[in-house]
From Swiss-Prot:
Bifunctional enzyme that catalyzes the oxidative decarboxylation of UDP-glucuronic acid (UDP-GlcUA) to UDP-4-keto-arabinose (UDP-Ara4O) and the addition of a formyl group to UDP-4-amino-4-deoxy-L-arabinose (UDP-L-Ara4N) to form UDP-L-4-formamido-arabinose (UDP-L-Ara4FN). The modified arabinose is attached to lipid A and is required for resistance to polymyxin and cationic antimicrobial peptides. It catalyses: UDP-alpha-D-glucuronate + NAD(+) = UDP-beta-L-threo-pentopyranos-4-ulose + CO2 + NADH; UDP-4-amino-4-deoxy-beta-L-arabinose + (6R)-10-formyltetrahydrofolate = UDP-4-deoxy-4-formamido-beta-L-arabinose + (6S)-5,6,7,8-tetrahydrofolate + H(+). The record marks D140 as: Raises pKa of active site His. The record marks N102 as: Transition state stabilizer. This is Bifunctional polymyxin resistance protein ArnA. NCBIfam families: PRK06988.1, PRK08125.1, PRK11908.1. Residues 314-660 are annotated as: Dehydrogenase ArnADH. It comes from Salmonella enteritidis PT4 (strain P125109).
Length: 660
């Protein structure tokens, strides 16, 4: 059987040798040229191929039609990929009659994506493995041929685990390749519900947050220990790297980041202390912890810090229009937690962002985007990333004020998009899950699902089509005029500071705020058309983390992309949401300050929203794009979100109002 192999790294060498030992003919090997900036501690596939007398190539783009044709001329029966770093096109995958197969460094479907070796250590896993699977268009998603488990010892670091995985891979290939050569190829579909995705790790991801649990910090040290770039921190302006550590349970009440002792060198974390066994100051040599403390001039009680702001590198300027809104104020908080971001914002109010007004990297102007066009144009020109978050996004307004919805959501935002085109600025635009309308797909795919809305005489759809039309305009500007953009589609984000109870009193709020108002005032909870409509509720913290990663745009992977941001696992009907909320309300310590529960009341949507309303039975996102582009996965359970949101609103009610 003739094989074409795509391979790199130690795993690539193991794979090539295993294929030869199994009696395959290798027509050619495709690999990568080594990057001079990378620590190439691993074996060379190109050198191995040359020594074996096998043709070897390292094209910049193996998916180019010229290379696809050359591979086709080789007429492979089967294709193998062993740690080749680029995805292969469907044209290449279809060239081999027996199929194309990839060796992945985890027990799929867990830890799809990049750097699974490091991520399993970061997350403190006790087991991983290697998996041979059939290659399909989606990375790491094809049917499983074979897998082998690998136990992770508590003293394993990245390099020792790497060696274990290489050994396991060789054992796996030695057992399965002869069987495959005879045409017997097992195939077990992956369980998508168990799939997790992780993105590429960068050297800067090794920055230690001393406010994390000590186990988290220790696992980070293990995950990026030499020959990887290492976990690091700062003493003043001096960077130092920790190469090995151990956990000490007692932090002696010290604040996170405080040096507890210098011999041994121990630093307080959130719930314990990290003992630094070996480390390195700057570009110096590796020394034991106590000598590192001496080199850095550390004394007991000193505080380690985050990296100093780099004077030679300008901070990234982010313009947020609608900064006082639900997404805007939470995003501002996330950005200001990072030293290299500066936030410029405008909104008609400042109640939700009052906590930032004195922050030196937050610049706010109170104003209306429909009036202050000169200020907006100037700041679009001045900033690096623009987020036009201003919109009317409450369903009752779609039928009550459809023209105002169109004027603000489409016309005013179109002007801002044109400024971004004019000054060649990147825009991160909030599309909406509403654009999918009455789509019948089980889960809504950004690139494939049809966008289906009702008839013109149903003004309820004016928000959806305004957003959809702007999505299409932005896409066209990207195609024709080079606008850098990302469209993100939130699916029912919830959390503190979502709307207000006053907005709920006039019916202009999202569902959970309205339900909380009913509980606070002792009025019946209204279930529109019985409350059987299903939504996927997403915690604001999960949503903001995904949005932050879009702004970071690692490797420009978000450019020109549409990304759903939602939690498919948190699907519930409005009735189920109300029941969960009521249960949390009854258990809340402030429950005694509010009236008795007034029951549920089923009402027709027309009587509640008015003429021209249509509802949607379900709305579940596919989040494959978010997993692939962001390395993001939602993690917060719906009950936690409901309890935190309820607590925020109950504590915001005035004491006098509670008593009444």
């Amino acid at each position: 059987m003739k094989a074409v192999i795509f391979a790199y790294h130690d795993m690539g060498c193991q794979g090539v040798q295993a294929v030869l030992d199994a009696g395959y003919e290798i027509a050619a090997i495709f690999t990568h040229a080594d990057n001079p900036a990378e620590n190439t501690f691993f074996g060379s596939v190109s050198r191995l191929a040359a020594e074996l007398g096998i043709p070897v190539y390292a094209p910049d783009n193996v998916n180019h039609p010229i290379w696809v044709d050359r591979i086709a001329e080789l007429a492979p029966d089967i294709i193998f990929s062993f740690y080749y770093r680029n995805l292969l096109s469907e044209e290449i995958l279809h060239l081999a009659p027996a199929g194309a197969f990839n060796l992945h460094g985890s027990l799929l479907p867990a830890y799809r994506g990049r750097a699974p070796l490091n991520w399993v250590l970061v997350n403190g896993e006790s087991e991983t493995g290697v998996t041979l699977h059939r290659m399909v268009k989606r990375a790491d998603a094809g049917e499983i041929v074979a897998s082998q488990r690998v136990a992770i010892a508590q003293d394993d670091v990245a390099l020792t685990l790497h060696h274990k995985l290489c050994q396991a891979a060789r054992q796996l290939l030695n057992s399965i390749l002869p069987t495959m050569k005879c045409g017997d190829i097992p195939s077990v579909p992956q369980r998508e519900s168990d799939a997790t995705y992780y993105g590429r790790r960068r050297p800067e991801d090794g920055l230690i947050d001393w406010h994390k649990p000590v186990s988290t910090v220790h696992n980070l040290v293990r995950a990026v220990a030499a020959p990887w770039p290492g976990a690091f921190s700062y003493n003043g302006s001096q960077k130092f790297t920790i190469w090995s550590s151990r956990i000490c349970p007692d932090a002696q009440g010290a604040l996170p980041g405080s040096v507890i002792s210098v011999s041994p060198l121990r630093v307080a974390c959130a719930d314990g202390a990290l003992e630094i066994i070996t480390g390195q100051a700057g570009d110096g040599i590796t020394v034991q912890g106590s000598q590192l403390a001496q080199t850095l001039g550390l004394v007991a009680g000193a505080r380690l810090n985050r990296p100093p702001a780099t004077s030679g590198k300008r901070r990234i300027r982010v313009l947020i229009l609608g900064v006082n809104g639900f997404i805007g104020n939470h995003l501002t908080e996330r950005l200001l937690n990072e030293e290299n971001y500066e936030v410029y914002g405008m909104d008609i109010g400042s109640n939700a962002i009052s906590r930032f007004l004195l922050h030196p990297r937050f610049h706010f102007v109170e104003g209306d985007i429909s009036i202050h066009s000169e200020w907006i144009e100037y700041h679009v020109k001045k900033c690096d990333v623009v987020l036009p978050l201003v919109a009317i996004a409450t369903p009752i307004e779609y039928t009550r004020n459809p023209l105002r919805v169109f004027e603000l959501d489409f016309e005013e935002n179109l002007r801002i998009i044109r400024y971004c085109v004019k000054y060649r600025k990147r825009v991160v635009f909030p599309s909406t899950s509403e654009v999918y309308g009455m789509c019948t797909d089980a889960s809504f795919d950004e690139d494939k699902s049809n966008l289906i809305v009702g008839p013109v005489n149903k003004p309820r759809w004016i928000y959806s089509v305004s957003k959809q039309l702007l999505d299409r305009v932005i896409w066209a500007y990207g195609e024709k005029e080079g606008l850098r953009f990302t469209l993100f589609r939130p699916f029912n984000w919830m959390g503190p500071r979502l709307d207000s109870l006053n907005a709920a009193r006039i019916g202009s709020s999202r569902a959970i705020t309205q339900l909380i108002l009913n509980l606070v005032e002792g009025t019946p909870i209204k279930l529109i058309d019985g409350g059987q409509q299903k939504r996927c509720f997403t915690d604001i913290r999960d949503g903001i983390e995904a949005l932050f990663r879009i702004i970071v745009n690692d490797g420009d992977r978000c450019d020109g992309k549409i990304i759903n941001i939602g939690n498919p696992d948190n699907e519930a009907s409005i009735q189920e949401l109300a029941t969960l909320l009521l249960d949390s309300f009854d258990k809340h310590p402030l429950r005694c300050h509010f009236p008795p529960f007034a029951g549920f009341q089923v009402v027709e949507s027309r009587s509640y929203y008015g003429k021209g309303y249509q509802d949607v039975a379900h709305r579940k996102p596919s989040i494959d794009n978010a997993r692939r582009c962001l390395g993001w996965e939602p993690s917060i359970a719906m009950r936690d979100t409901v309890e935190e949101t309820l607590d925020f609103f109950l504590r915001s009610v005035d004491v006098a109002e509670r008593a009444s």
